[in-house]
Each structure stands twice: as structure tokens, then as C-alpha cells.
Amino acid sequence: MNFIHDPLTPRVLFGAGRLQSLGEELKLLGIRRVLVISTPEQRELANQVAALIPGSVAGFFDRATMHVPSQIVDQAASVARELGVDSYVAPGGGSTIGLAKMLALHSSLPIVAIPTTYAGSEMTSIYGVTENELKKTGRDRRVLARTVIYDPELTFGLPTGISVTSGLNAIAHAVEGLYAPEVNPILAIMAQQGIAALAKSIPTIRSAPTDLEARSQAQYGAWLCGSVLGNVSMALHHKLCHTLGGTFNLPHAETHTVVLPHALAYNTPAIPRANAWLQEALATREPAQALFDLAKSNGAPVSLQSIGMKEADLDRACELVMSAQYPNPRPLEKHAIANLLRRAYLGEPPQP
């Protein structure tokens, strides 16, 4: 056995009611002038968070949006400068936390993330921004949240459909982590536990959305899966999703949900060790098919067509994916990638 484990992770507060610790956490971090960030739809949550720290709120920015458009980043940065803030508090999902990351990248100010979905972005130093219909990603320690507060009670309002796709989005992070070059025994255990926790909790959340134990297990799984992604490099799955989301404006979690079984099936012949770990985590001999079935049986989309992809754009998507080779367990083959995209578009079962 020979490996390096150099974890890059924020401080984590976890548990029902943990949001009430926000004021104490800001004092611990020496934070005094907060910009509270949200999407327009989650402004009420932003107000709820601000009410806990009335003396520390410098202002709000409630125009966060999917895929972090560069013009929104510029608008938020201008507001932050005008208010003279010293930090960002980001209650919400990937859109809100993603915007906070881009602001931190340019200002080096700390983030306190309060995730309300299972996307896992809060646990990584990965950032992304969309400019001219192309999504660019990178890594930088400046964008890693200083503290993450997981309060499963905040996920009660997450619609069941979004809960399912957000959970599968998190699973995708850990799946890709299991065949990353940086994987080690510790990350493998975290990935397996995260995948198992989410796979078990998703059906319960769909049938009982306010089941606190299921919501807690899902956030626990999201924390683990996000932590794995934060310590490994990304490969085919995330490349596909960034291309489809950033260029064709497909919804983030739904795109991950649709693509995951197909990207895994493509790589399966080249990842025997990771496949064995996945078989154990999902209690199945066919992990790719099991993930397809998990999505379909819980009402999640299984086709790109159903989430807004146009058939006429499949060729362009394939060209974009093939335009820059990058590390992947199985070399990228244009004909095979085109077939993968076609199956994902139609919602057909995954194939190697």
C-alpha cells in the first residue's frame, strides 16, 4: 500500500438546528460585515439567515443563477465593493455557493456556506463560471469555504424531485472520485459511505420528504461525496456535464443525473477496482444500471431530451467534449462518445 492523503476541507458543523450556530461562527472567524447571497427564489431563506446575525449584515445580493454567468459575478462584486464587506454567507445550492466562490476567487474573502441541496460544491475548491456559452472551471484554495453549516431541517423545503436529482449529483462526485488517479483508501471509504447513504435515503425522501433521519443521511452522504470530489481530479462525467450545462444551458443536477450511468458504463471496462467498490456500495453487480434504475424509479429524468437538449446539438456537444483530451481511465473515442450522448439523449439504458 502506497498513497498520499493531504485533505483539503473546510470546518464543518453538522446537525438539526445547527443554523443557530451561525452568529457564534462568525465571531470565531472575526467576521463583521457580511454579504448574504441567494437566488431570487431563496431570498426568504436569505432573510431568515440574516435575522440570526442582524448586526453583521452589510447587505444582500439575490441574483445568483445557474452556471454562474460572468455578468452576474461582476454585478455581485460591484455590490460587495460598494458595501465594504469582509465575507460572504451563502445559504442555498450550487448556484449561490458557486457565485460566492467566484467572488472569493477575486477578493480572497472568506465564505460561510449553508447548503440546502446535496450538490456538494461547498466542500471543494473547485469553481466554475460561464462566459460566451462556455463553462470554465478551475481550482483555487481561496474559494474553499471557511465553514460549512449542514442543517438538515433546511432541506425540508427542497422539492422531492430536486432532492432526487441533487442526491444523484452528489453520488456522481464520489463515483468519479473512485477512479481518479488521486484515490486512496481513505477517500475510497468516504466515497463508498457517501454513495450508500444517498442511495438508501433518496427513495425515503421521495416518499416522506420531512423524514429527518433520511434528510440527515442524505446531507451526510453529500458531505462525504463533496469531500471526495474536493480531493481528486475530474474526468469524463464532469467534462460532459460542464459542456452540456454551460453550452446548452441544461439544468445542473438533472444533467448529472442523466449522464452519470452512461459515463460510468463507458469507463467500467477500464476501472475494475473502482467497479468493485461501487458494487459493494450499491449492493449490485451492475453499478451503472443500478444508478439508471435509481433515477428512473424515483421519478428523475433519464434522458437529455426531457431536460431541454436538442437533437441537433448532439454533434456539437461531441465535438466540444473531444476538443481537449484530459485524463480519463478509458481514452476518449469520438464514435463511442457520440453513441454515449445519443443513448443519454434518448434515455436508453447505459452500455459500455
UniProtKB/Swiss-Prot annotation:
Broad class of enzyme this protein falls into: oxidoreductase
Any Pfam family the entry gives: Fe-ADH
Keywords for this protein: Aromatic hydrocarbons catabolism, NAD, Oxidoreductase, Plasmid
Gene3D superfamilies: 3.40.50.1970, Dehydroquinate synthase-like - alpha domain (1.20.1090.10)
The keyword Oxidoreductase belongs to this UniProt entry's keyword annotation: yes
Gene Ontology molecular function: any one: metal ion binding
SUPFAM superfamilies (UniProt xref): Dehydroquinate synthase-like
EC numbers on record: 1.3.1.32
A GO biological-process term: 2,4-dichlorophenoxyacetic acid catabolic process
SS bond list: none
Oxidoreductase in keyword set: yes
Pathway assignment: Aromatic compound metabolism; 3-chlorocatechol degradation
Catalytic activity: 3-oxoadipate + NAD(+) = maleylacetate + NADH + H(+); 3-oxoadipate + NADP(+) = maleylacetate + NADPH + H(+)
Family: Belongs to the iron-containing alcohol dehydrogenase family.
Protein name: Maleylacetate reductase
Organism lineage: Bacteria, Pseudomonadati, Pseudomonadota, Gammaproteobacteria, Pseudomonadales
Gene for this chain: tcbF
